[in-house]
């Protein structure tokens, strides 16, 4: 086997004909500045070629489902293994996807509960056992005399197919009727079932009338039905509810029977297991009273009621007619604040008067009074939501709805009879609600009978192994019931990493994108040990990473640079960590060796004397915790993964401020009191979401500098002579753009079974504008050539235009100098998008009363980029604003004015404020994991070699 993966002539994106040998079966780190070409080499070249070769080895039939993969721009790659990419894309936004289902642990749980679980009656809780034929007969004979009953044998339950043989066998046995999907069919008829749909088929064994002398006949029919179906009998009571009997399990006291336990009954994605009310989602969208009336200080006349169709309180409106009638009954007017309504008045306003009529004044119609019950605002909205076919109407009503746990299953997703099956005293949903650590403890101490051991030991081992893999990547705080859509990119990636460890493959090439993101320094060792295990199995790991611990643990390091964009794309350094520390060419090496460093501020800001205090925070695992943030400071919220940082900052702090200051329709998580909002005028969340979702959006349009550039072109002598205004230089409207491609510069060719192909427009040659518009020039450049400039080039080009130069300089300050002005927003990384947002904010006039919130802004950033980011954040604070950052990166934490450290652990063991204060104060706290790692960094102060 070859010792190296040899990449020759890699030219994808900004790569400059790279020729490199990567050692196999080693942990290899690719590092370098953001935008230098690391991902282009790792993902777009090496992984893409590995995947393409694998797909090409499949049959043409299989390839049509996987899509055509383009060959990356590379001469050749030797020594390539099958490649698996583990990136930071969140696992799934499907509300049915959970940590348990993604890791396949839930599949083993379903098998375990189905095979060795103990069923109970969902009504009385008593253990239930199999029913005998005599017990079934006694239950039927207890029905009221002369009751007509149809006895059915369910032979097919929820299975796809045409089931021709089932019908043939029934005919041969002399049966004349069958119930198919709820409808009775005569077997003499010819009918065909849809092959791709699931069906329920029951043989009609007998139709009987309950009488004392019919016992013998009923007994024969029940025995026959039971034999046909394998123990199940359905008694379809005419004019009543059908009764299912089982020779497997039934409650003597309540007369409730359940089927024999099968794994599919424990799946919330299967109709046989899912709660019938919420269909297995665990949540329901319901109209929220607090959204219908968000401000109870207002009166109806002042617009207190924000619901669709109920906001108009003008005289003569239908809504006002009901409001006046209710007011007459309860003694309020339309000018009375809602908070002064009696409890009954508010209840009837929201939920209606039931059958009790109101006296409605309808003088404008008939000159009299009409008596009619009031449906209530909430029932009215929910009825309209169910009945309407209009997407617009549904959207209007959804604005006052919120998700709440299903009232039937209380968020547990399953049917009552399934939730009544226990193992060790827990049902499957209660077990899924435990954290990984607690679940392992439960299984470790689970007491089973000898028979249960024989059946369940192998299944329990599989579950324990997978839980152990999750623990090994620092995810011990997650619960198996947690929705996949709520996981961060880093958590999703580590779940996939844990799944790969479980597969125990060898000879594979794994390519990972910053697996340390979202991970506290304390948990880094676990992650590195996990990566080491994958390597020791005989795999090659290529890790795109900026984390210094990972670099020190690597067998081989490749530094791509020296700059970003067109200034990058070269191999600056490759070798061991010791060689990197001595390298003068590598910026990474200079920071790791301490020659370059992010300085610790000499003075910590005390703030402007004002603060925000949030009391009694109780979202997720927060333990009614109080937090205070001094305004006019850079505040870092720290703590181990799962300690409650995002719960406080994103769910309470941001959502409350957005609702109060920005008028957003967000609803803050549970808390008791929020003090100090009056000290702020707006809140801005600067996240890593894309700055635009279409190719038309670019950094120039997002930051607003393109408006100024278009104005400048419109003022040129040539433009004035032709009568062109600023809109002529827009590629979004007709006039100056190329109409053949509608200003995109590209044409989409639909290939049907293959991916769509984009080709440059043959009219404008990809330049987006028509010929006449491109003839207008400023300083020798037309509008397309300006958009094709990098920010650095544009800074020099527009140096004499202060308005444009100021915005461009801000973009350069945040590290976007290498990005082209017209580069499509869809091609920007999350870190680049975030810096574009920061540049936009920096270029605005500051009020000094803005609070900026950032969640792990160092994601995807090299230490040199982090240095630049810290400078930008400090500038925002210097302007009088407040910056709150959730962060694990010690280089950012050490520059903060104030720290809120949550923990001490993740999950149930977190949710408390361990310590708050300056970095120096936090470093002295022995109970703080953050403090333990921060101490040595502060002691090193400015520069000095990192201890390792």
Predicted features and spans:
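Conserved phosphate-binding elements of NTP-dependent enzyme cores
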Residues: 1-948
């Amino acid at each position: 086997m070859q010792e190296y993966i040899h990449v020759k002539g890699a030219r994808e994106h900004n790569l400059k004909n790279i020729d490199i040998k990567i050692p196999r079966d080693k942990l290899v780190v690719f590092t370098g500045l953001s935008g230098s070409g690391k991902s282009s080499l790792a993902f777009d070249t090496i992984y893409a070629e590995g995947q393409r070769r694998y797909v090409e080895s499949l049959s043409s039939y299989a390839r049509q489902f996987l899509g055509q993969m383009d060959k990356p721009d590379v001469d050749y790659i030797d020594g390539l293994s099958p490649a698996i990419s583990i990136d930071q894309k969140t696992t799934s936004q499907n509300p049915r996807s959970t940590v348990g289902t993604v890791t396949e642990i839930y599949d083993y749980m379903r098998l375990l509960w189905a095979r060795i679980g103990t069923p109970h009656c969902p009504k009385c809780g008593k253990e239930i056992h199999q029913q005998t034929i005599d017990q079934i007969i006694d239950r039927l004979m207890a029905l009221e005399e002369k009751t007509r009953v149809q006895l059915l044998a369910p032979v097919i339950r929820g299975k796809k197919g045409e089931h021709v043989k089932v019908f043939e066998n029934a005919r041969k046995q002399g049966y004349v009727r069958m119930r198919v999907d709820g409808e009775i069919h005569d077997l003499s008829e010819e009918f065909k079932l849809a092959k791709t749909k699931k069906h329920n088929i029951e043989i009609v064994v007998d139709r009987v009338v309950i009488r004392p002398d019919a016992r013998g006949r009923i007994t024969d029919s029940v025995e026959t039905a039971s034999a046909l179906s394998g123990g199940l009998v359905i008694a379809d009571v005419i004019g009543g509810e059908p009764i299912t009997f089982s020779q497997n399990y039934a409650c003597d006291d309540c007369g409730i029977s359940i089927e024999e336990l099968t794994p599919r009954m424990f799946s919330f994605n299967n109709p046989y297991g899912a709660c019938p009310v919420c269909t297995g989602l665990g949540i329901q969208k319901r109209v929220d009273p607090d959204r219908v009336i968000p401000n109870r200080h207002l009166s109806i006349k002042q617009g207190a009621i924000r619901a669709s169709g109920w906001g108009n309180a003008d005289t003569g409106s239908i809504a006002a007619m009901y409001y006046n009638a209710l007011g007459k009954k309860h003694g309020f007017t339309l000018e009375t604040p809602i908070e002064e309504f009696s409890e009954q008045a508010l209840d009837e306003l929201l939920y209606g008067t039931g059958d009790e009529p109101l006296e409605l004044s309808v003088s404008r119609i008939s000159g009299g009074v009409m008596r009619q019950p009031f449906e209530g605002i909430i029932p009215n909205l929910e009825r309209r939501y169910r009945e309407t076919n209009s997407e617009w109407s549904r959207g209007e009503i959804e604005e006052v709805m919120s998700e709440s746990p299903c009232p039937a299953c209380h968020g547990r997703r399953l049917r009552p009879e399934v939730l009544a099956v226990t193992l060790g005293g827990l049902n499957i949903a209660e077990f899924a609600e435990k954290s990984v650590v607690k679940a392992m403890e439960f299984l470790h101490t689970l007491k089973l009978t000898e028979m249960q051991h024989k059946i369940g030991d192998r299944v329990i081992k599989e579950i324990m192994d997978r839980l152990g893999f999750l623990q090994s990547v620092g995810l011990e705080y997650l619960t198996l019931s947690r929705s996949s859509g709520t996981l961060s990119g880093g958590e999703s990636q580590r779940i996939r990493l844990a799944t790969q460890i479980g597969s125990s493959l060898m000879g594979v090439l794994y390519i990972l994108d910053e697996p340390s993101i979202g991970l506290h320094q304390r948990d880094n060792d676990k992650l590195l040990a996990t990566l080491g295990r994958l390597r020791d199995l005989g795999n090659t790991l290529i890790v795109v990473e900026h984390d210094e611990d990972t670099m020190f643990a690597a067998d081989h390091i490749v530094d791509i640079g020296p700059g970003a964009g067109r200034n990058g794309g070269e191999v600056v350094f490759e070798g061991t960590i010791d060689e990197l520390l001595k390298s003068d060419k590598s910026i990474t090496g200079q920071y790791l060796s301490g020659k370059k460093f992010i300085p610790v501020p000499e003075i910590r800001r005390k703030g402007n004397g004002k603060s925000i205090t949030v009391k009694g925070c109780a979202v997720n695992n927060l333990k009614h915790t109080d937090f205070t943030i001094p305004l006019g400071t850079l505040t870092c919220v720290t703590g181990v993964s799962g300690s409650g940082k995002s719960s406080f900052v994103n769910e309470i702090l941001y959502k409350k401020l957005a609702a109060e200051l920005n008028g957003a329709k967000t609803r803050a998580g549970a808390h008791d009191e929020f003090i100090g909002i009056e000290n702020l005028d707006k809140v801005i969340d600067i996240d890593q979401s894309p700055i635009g979702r279409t190719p038309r959006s670019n950094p120039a349009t997002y930051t607003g500098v393109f408006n100024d550039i278009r104005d400048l072109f419109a003022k040129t002598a040539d433009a004035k002579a032709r009568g062109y205004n600023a809109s002529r230089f827009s590629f979004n409207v007709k006039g100056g753009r190329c109409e053949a491609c509608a200003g995109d510069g590209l044409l989409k060719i639909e290939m049907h079974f293959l991916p769509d192909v984009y080709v440059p427009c043959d009219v404008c040659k990809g330049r987006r504008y028509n010929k006449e518009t491109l003839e207008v020039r400023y300083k020798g450049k037309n509008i397309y050539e300006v958009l094709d400039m990098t920010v650095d080039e544009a800074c020099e080009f527009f140096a004499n235009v202060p308005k444009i130069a100021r915005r461009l300089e801000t973009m350069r300050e945040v590290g976007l100098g290498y990005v082209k002005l017209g580069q499509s927003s869809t091609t920007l990384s999350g870190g680049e998008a975030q810096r574009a947002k920061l540049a936009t904010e920096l270029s605005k006039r500051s009020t000094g009363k803005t609070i900026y919130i950032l969640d792990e802004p160092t994601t995807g950033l090299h230490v040199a980029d982090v240095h630049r980011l810290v400078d930008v954040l400090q500038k925002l604070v210097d302007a009088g604003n407040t910056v709150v950052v959730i962060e694990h990166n010690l280089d950012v934490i050490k520059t903060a004015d104030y720290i809120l450290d949550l923990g001490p652990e993740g999950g149930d063991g977190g949710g408390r404020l361990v310590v708050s204060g300056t970095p120096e104060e936090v470093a002295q706290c022995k109970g703080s994991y953050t403090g333990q790692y921060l101490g040595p960094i502060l002691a090193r102060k400015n520069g000095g070699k990192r201890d390792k």
